[in-house]
Regions:
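N-terminal soluble domains immediately following signal/targeting peptides that reside
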Residues: 1-135
C-alpha cells in the first residue's frame, strides 16, 4: 500500500469569497477554537466541484486529515491535507484543479507531484483544468 498525500494551500480571503461570498468574513473561523461546525462541509462541497484526483482511473475520496493557517492578514493561507491509501501500484494520476477559476478568470493553480523519487510540476487553469500523468 502507498499513501497519496494531497496538500492544498488556499488564500483564506479566496476561500471566504468562494464559500460565503465575502473575502473579509470571519463566519467560518477555520482552524480557530470556535470554528463553524459547517466549515469543513462547506469547504469539501466547494472542492468536490473543482478538484479531484483519479488514481488508476478511480476517483479518490477527499477526506480532510488536517488543516492549518499560515501567514498574516490578507496573506493568510489555509493549508488542507488529504490522505488516501492506494492499494495497487500507481499507473496513472489524473488531477483536476479548477479551484477559484469560478471567481478569478486568470486563476492558475500550481501542482507538484512527487512519485517514486521523481517530481513533476503542472499549471492548471480555467482553460486546462485537468492533466493526466502516466507512470
Amino acid at each position: 500500500d502507498e499513501i497519496l498525500t494531497i496538500n492544498l494551500r488556499l488564500f483564506l480571503t479566496d476561500v471566504n469569497e468562494a464559500l460565503v461570498f465575502d473575502p473579509e468574513s470571519t463566519e467560518l473561523r477555520f482552524c480557530q477554537p470556535d470554528e463553524s461546525p459547517t466549515a469543513d462541509l462547506m469547504l469539501l462541497d466547494y472542492l468536490n466541484n473543482y478538484f479531484y484526483i483519479e488514481a488508476n482511473g478511480n476517483q479518490t475520496p477527499l477526506t480532510i486529515k488536517n488543516k492549518k493557517l499560515k501567514g498574516d492578514g490578507i496573506n493568510t493561507a489555509l493549508g488542507v491535507t488529504f490522505e488516501h491509501t492506494q492499494r495497487a501500484p500507481l499507473r496513472s494520476l489524473k488531477i483536476k484543479n479548477a479551484v477559484f477559476t469560478d471567481l478569478f478568470y486568470d486563476q492558475t493553480n500550481i501542482i507538484y507531484v512527487h512519485v517514486n523519487g521523481t517530481s513533476t510540476s503542472l499549471m492548471l487553469n480555467k482553460k486546462t483544468p485537468t492533466h493526466t500523468l502516466v507512470f
